[in-house]
Amino acid sequence: MERSRVTREAPTGTRILLASLSAMVAESVTFPIDLTKTRMQLHGSGSASGAHRIGAFGVVSEIARKEGVIGLYKGLSPAIIRHLFYTPIRIIGYENLKGLIVRSETNNSESLPLATKALVGGFSGVIAQVVASPADLVKVRMQADGRLVSQGLKPRYSGPIEAFTKILQSEGVKGLWKGVLPNIQRAFLVNMGELACYDHAKHFVIDKKIAEDNIFAHTLASIMSGLASTSLSCPADVVKTRMMNQGENAVYRNSYDCLVKTVKFEGIRALWKGFFPTWARLGPWQFVFWVSYEKFRLLAGISSF
């Protein structure tokens, strides 16, 4: 049965709350996959000879064996903190920017071309990522620390607060934004793929009578957006992860140097390291997020995304 089309304009505060809550649920459910992706992307980082290939299941088995099941959630707290800033800014930013374009062109939002939606989504993602980059840095560092623990070494940080403090002390305020360039490049590509594709695909599915505005339409749209955003963003994600994991003794001078060295020492395929776990995370993450967000909006009496 088609959901009722509620048209009440939602207060910005309500939309921020719903987006944050949906993101927290999605992040908690899919975080072990994100950890697997990060460990795979760091595998072979800085090695001139490359390293033997290791698959997603091998990484998960190694983490569970050496760090226990709790090791699969290493870095969850900064990840949730990040999403309290990142997701509301990009989601509400996308809706508001799209609304401005619609009002200026006296058009309706569903008729906007995909290219326009893609640019709006990318720009919203850039703004959100600049704000959330310090929390993203801490998340990556804490996820990478698990490798030290598995080798019997002491981790660099005991928690997110200590991580923030140590980074500030040793690398300065600018250190919190280390890797921000590949970070925003990835954010632009991810949100260009996710927001625009989800928005466009959902309305296409509904308009073509493939499904009504329900969980089936949301699932189809989230699968398509997950594939699009993963394909576009994976190379930038690899570079971002390696740049952000660097401490004071940097292996890479900048994101371009990281890109060149990765291809030189590990081959072009290394730019898509972690593609499967990235997609395996983005797919479920987007499914959980969008289904939750659409449901929360419906319960709050707000029109669908």
From Swiss-Prot:
The lineage of its organism: Eukaryota, Viridiplantae, Streptophyta, Embryophyta, Tracheophyta. GO terms for cellular component: mitochondrial inner membrane. It comes from Arabidopsis thaliana. It holds the Pfam family Mito_carr. Its main location: mitochondrion. Solcar repeats lie at residues 14-100, 112-204, 213-299. The gene is PUMP3. Keywords: Membrane, Mitochondrion, Mitochondrion inner membrane, Repeat, Stress response, Transmembrane, Transmembrane helix, Transport. PUMPS are mitochondrial transporter proteins that create proton leaks across the inner mitochondrial membrane, thus uncoupling oxidative phosphorylation. This leads to a decrease in the efficiency of oxidative phosphorylation and an increase in heat production. May be involved in protecting plant cells against oxidative stress damage. This is Mitochondrial uncoupling protein 3. One of its GO terms (molecular function) is transmembrane transporter activity. The chain crosses the membrane at residues 16-36, 69-89, 118-138, 178-198, 219-239, 272-292.
